[in-house]
C-alpha cells in the first residue's frame, strides 16, 4: 500500500524527497520528444529468426554502457540517437537484464538519473523496460514509493510486462 511504501524509507532514516504524492508523480511525468520518437522508429528491431541476433544484443549492451558513461561524465546526454538505440534494444530481455545487472553501489546514482531521464522521454511502447529498471534502482536505494509508482508507469505502458508484474508481487 501507499502507506507501507512511504513508511519504509522513513523507518530507515531516509527522508522523503517530495512533500507529497503529486510532487513525486510530477518528477516522473512523461515528456514528449519527437526526435527520439522518430529515431526509435528508424532503428530496426531484433529479428530473432534471422542471423545476427547476438550482434544486435551486443550493440544494445554497448549502447547502455556508452550512455551510462556519458551520464557519469556529464550528468546527461544530448545524443538522441544513442538514447533511441538504448530504448529500442531494451525491448530485448538480454539487453534489459544486462542493464539491470550493471547497477552497482558505485554507479547507482548515475543509473538512477539515466533511467529516470529515459523513462520520462521514452515514447509509448518503450516505457515499460526503462520504468522497470528505474523501479528496481529505486527499490535498491530504499525508495519504495518511487519504485511502486515507476512500476505503475511500466504497467500503464504495457499491462502484461512480465518483469513489472513480478516486481509488483515482490514489493
Give, region by region, the residue ranges found by the protein language model.
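Charged, compositionally biased boundary regions
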Residues: 1-171
Amino acid at each position: 500500500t501507499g502507506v507501507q511504501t512511504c513508511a519504509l524509507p522513513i523507518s530507515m532514516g531516509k527522508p522523503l524527497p517530495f512533500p507529497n504524492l503529486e510532487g513525486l508523480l510530477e518528477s516522473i511525468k512523461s515528456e514528449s520528444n519527437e526526435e527520439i520518437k522518430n529515431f526509435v522508429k528508424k532503428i530496426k528491431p531484433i529479428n530473432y529468426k534471422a542471423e545476427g541476433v547476438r550482434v544486435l544484443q551486443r550493440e544494445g549492451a554497448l549502447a547502455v554502457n556508452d550512455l551510462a558513461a556519458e551520464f557519469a561524465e556529464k550528468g546527461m546526454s544530448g545524443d538522441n540517437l544513442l538514447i533511441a538505440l538504448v530504448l529500442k534494444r531494451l525491448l530485448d530481455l538480454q539487453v534489459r537484464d544486462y542493464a539491470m545487472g550493471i547497477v552497482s553501489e558505485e554507479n547507482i546514482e548515475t543509473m538512477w538519473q539515466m533511467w529516470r531521464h529515459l523513462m520520462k522521454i521514452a515514447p509509448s511502447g518503450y516505457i515499460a523496460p526503462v520504468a522497470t529498471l528505474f523501479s528496481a534502482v529505486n527499490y535498491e536505494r530504499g525508495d519504495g514509493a518511487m519504485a511502486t509508482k515507476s512500476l505503475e508507469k511500466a504497467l500503464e505502458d504495457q499491462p502484461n510486462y512480465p518483469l513489472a508484474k513480478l516486481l509488483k508481487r515482490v514489493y
